[in-house]
Amino acid sequence: MAIDTSLPKDIRILQAAEEVFSQHGYEKATLDEIIALADVGKGTVYKYFGNKEHLFYKLVADKNVPFLEKLHQAVNSVDSFEDKLKKYFEVMVHFYVANSTLWQIICFEMLGGTNGCRVEPDGDDFKVIPRYNSVKVSEETSERILRYHKILHDEYNILSQLIEQAMHDNLLKHDTVPEITTKFVFFGVAMSIFNQSDDIAADMTDEEAARIITDHFLRGNAR
């Protein structure tokens, strides 16, 4: 991949970062490779982004903002619960296929699983706790994990609100637990895309994928 050297340096760095992170993941990606691809000096990267983690966060956060806007616009463009689900999943499938590797990095490298941590609700907020007694979570690690958790939470919270409203409108079973149901569906779709994104992109439109996901959620596979 060649980067247009007429672009502003920060844009070149972000484009190079997306290429390198997508090829190597977070841990194995190096700033040196990003710097070489962007054709900038090392000091320029530190000037704009500080370090590798801040650069990766800037990259995915900048993608997340318009994604959230599209999700909100999609669900607000129709009236029925079923149509809102279809629109939500159309946008989600399109985005996750296009950004599969970067969002896999968020889920598998940045959320603390490899550090023996997990995120739990803490009142109206969230907290990071160790999975094992031997794990000590530093403040820096906790802050990093929560930054990436917020990205995913903001995405699936839109779906959660749809499910909660559907329960209020007596459209779902009364024993439905919104948080569990939301995560089950959201991360089930995400993991399917992570493992089969090429097949989904080649063989199925976003609309068809969304129709199948919505139909299975509302009706299951029963005859």
What does each model-found stretch correspond to?
Residues 104-106, 174-175, 197:
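Short, hydrophobic secondary-structure boundary micro-motifs
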Residues 116-169, 179-183:
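Amphipathic alpha-helical packing segments from all-alpha helical-bundle domains
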Residues 58, 73-101, 182-185:
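Hydrophobic alpha-helical connector segments
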Residues 1-24, 28-40, 54:
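Basic, helix-initiating cap at the start of DNA-binding domains
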Residues 56, 60, 64, 85, ...:
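Amphipathic, non-transmembrane alpha-helical scaffold segments
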Residues 94, 157-169, 183-223:
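C-terminal peripheral helix-coil segments that are non-catalytic and often amphipathic
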Residues 22, 46-50, 57-58, 62:
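Base-recognition residues in the alpha-helical recognition helix of bacterial helix-turn-helix
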